């Protein structure tokens, strides 16, 4: 327990010393690409009410900003099996619903919307789900859409095995607290961006995928986190002395790989690279000597689920935000009517 506390403090201290370190898909490349495709998939799936290009860029910007400053990334983990965040801290699911102010402040940035310059700063950096619904209800749609991007960033992170299998990856050696790097995130960061991912939403749609409809934001966290946790490995969770997950399991081996079956599609995919240590012992890894084919297979399986669940979060946002807007207007009307009654009573006295 003492060791766990030391690690937690060390992680926070390390983030403060080295703000360039990150725990996520690269925000300006992969997160931006995923958010772009989520919005496009939502638009392709709807007959009317398309999200405009301007609003789409706001949502993408919010998704990028969720990693700024990098201390926020400590809250981007959720192990759905044990219901914990990184090293037992609060999870991303909790973070999305309850702002953890000490590590939550975003940097100043400004937007120009319909010719108007808007500065987002100070206490306006609360992008939790209840808060962004409130922003929308009260007419502050700019912050609401930025906040939606922040939430989508977290959902996208639930599609990263490292984030759902409690595997921090700040880097090699002492600077990274010997947590190592994430082969999957390094690969996606170098290969997946807005340009290379363009058209992925249309591809997912043509395969018959639809917006995932769930009843709550928490359900989307569970859906994505359980899928990535149970079906994919991170580098340090193939075999781990701290906690060994019961899933995933290799269904079959050939001379080079171990394979599994995706429960969503029924398709076989590469789960691990299989090698031998020379003593008859099998070694399983997700990347080896420049071989990234397992990582590529992971992305092929994970990306459609991120897109359909992300689009579901967008759908849920508009549903709950409009309901909150209606409640807010009714409450404001009630307050106004009560004020008029009090004023009339005072005038009669």
Where are these regions (language model features)?
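A general boundary/transition motif marking the beginning of the first structured unit of a protein
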Residues: 1-2, 298
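Bacterial N-terminal signal peptides that target proteins for export
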Residues: 2-10
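Bacterial N-terminal signal peptides
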Residues: 10-19
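N-terminal, motif-rich segments that launch catalysis or mediate targeting to/interaction with membranes
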Residues: 22-150, 154-157, 161-332, 336, ...
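Non-catalytic terminal regions with compositionally biased, polar/charged low complexity
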Residues: 347-349
């Amino acid at each position: 327990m003492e060791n766990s506390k030391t690690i937690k403090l060390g992680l926070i201290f390390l983030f403060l010393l080295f703000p360039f370190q990150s725990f996520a898909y690269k925000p300006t490349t992969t997160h931006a690409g995923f958010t772009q495709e989520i919005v496009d998939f939502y638009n392709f799936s709807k007959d009317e009410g398309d999200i405009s290009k301007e609003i789409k860029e706001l949502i993408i910007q919010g998704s990028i900003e969720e990693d700024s400053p990098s201390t926020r990334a400590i809250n981007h983990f959720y192990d759905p099996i044990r219901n914990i965040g990184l090293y037992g801290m609060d999870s991303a699911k909790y973070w999305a619903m309850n702002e953890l102010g000490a590590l939550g402040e975003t940097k100043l940035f400004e937007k120009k919307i319909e010719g108007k310059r808007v500065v987002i700063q100070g206490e306006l950096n609360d992008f939790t789900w209840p808060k962004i619904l409130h922003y929308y209800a009260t007419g502050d749609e700019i912050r609401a859409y930025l906040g939606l991007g922040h939430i989508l960033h977290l959902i996208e992170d639930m599609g990263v095995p490292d984030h759902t299998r409690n595997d921090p990856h700040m880097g090699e050696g002492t600077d990274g607290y010997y947590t190592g790097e994430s082969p999957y995130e390094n690969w996606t960061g170098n290969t997946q961006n807005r340009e290379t991912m363009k058209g992925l939403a249309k591809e997912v749609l043509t395969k018959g995928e639809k917006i995932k409809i769930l009843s709550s934001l928490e359900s989307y966290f569970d859906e994505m986190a359980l899928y990535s946790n149970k079906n994919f490995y991170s580098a340090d969770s193939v075999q781990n002395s701290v906690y060994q997950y019961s899933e995933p399991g290799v269904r079959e081996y050939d001379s080079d790989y171990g394979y599994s079956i995706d429960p969503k599609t029924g398709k076989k995919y590469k789960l691990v690279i299989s090698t031998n240590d020379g003593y008859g012992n099998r070694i399983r890894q997700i990347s080896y000597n420049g071989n990234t084919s397992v990582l590529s297979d992971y992305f092929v399986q994970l990306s459609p689920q991120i897109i359909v669940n992300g689009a579901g979060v967008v759908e849920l946002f508009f549903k709950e935000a409009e309901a909150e807007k209606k409640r807010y207007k009714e409450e404001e009307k009630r307050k106004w009517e009560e004020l008029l009654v009090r004023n009339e009573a005072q005038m009669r006295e």
